[in-house]
């Protein structure tokens, strides 16, 4: 079985388990468009989107390695912001950004918030901050996720934070598939930039 066939099988298995396209996209570190293509592949006239699959489960499933990469993310952000005011809260994007944000918040003794993006909402209307964690209003917030694929989720949370009177001060990711320096004026701090060469 080819890696494409394996990816299609994973997407179809997750879909059969009841996951939404947005949840599958997060699980496989792909765009929603790519997941849609994987689920409908074989239908005439649908061209494959340009995307890159990143499998980082060797790190994400090992708390020692996950802690190490979280520390690297925090160190990268802090090195670029030595003169700036601090951060009050770290916000993890559900699902993969949550463990990273938790470890970063614990390392620096910061509040933790969790954002559920609109793509996880069955109606797909709006995203929200979990009420079980830190409030974000009037706080300087560091946003954490595993990967920038399209940037839509990060644009969504930046706008959400501003509407709720919070100040997004940075976006930390492990992988950036877009090669962006900022999203909506908020600086991006990525450990790795992934570029597709066609």
Curated annotation (Swiss-Prot):
Keyword Transcription: yes
Keywords of this entry: DNA-binding, Transcription, Transcription regulation
GO biological process: pyrimidine nucleobase biosynthetic process; regulation of gene expression; UMP biosynthetic process
Disulfide pairings: none
GO molecular function terms listed in the Swiss-Prot or TrEMBL record: DNA binding; orotate phosphoribosyltransferase activity
Alphabetized CDD domains for the sequence: PRTases_typeI
SUPFAM superfamilies attached to this UniProt entry: PRTase-like
Pfam families, sorted: Pribosyltran
Family statement drawn from the similarity comment of this UniProt entry: Belongs to the purine/pyrimidine phosphoribosyltransferase family. GfcR subfamily.
Domain comment in the entry: Contains an N-terminal DNA-binding winged helix-turn-helix domain and a C-terminal regulatory domain (or effector binding domain) resembling phosphoribosyltransferase (PRT) domain.
Protein name, as recorded: Transcriptional regulator GfcR
Source organism of the structure: Methanocorpusculum labreanum (strain ATCC 43576 / DSM 4855 / Z)
Protein's gene: gfcR
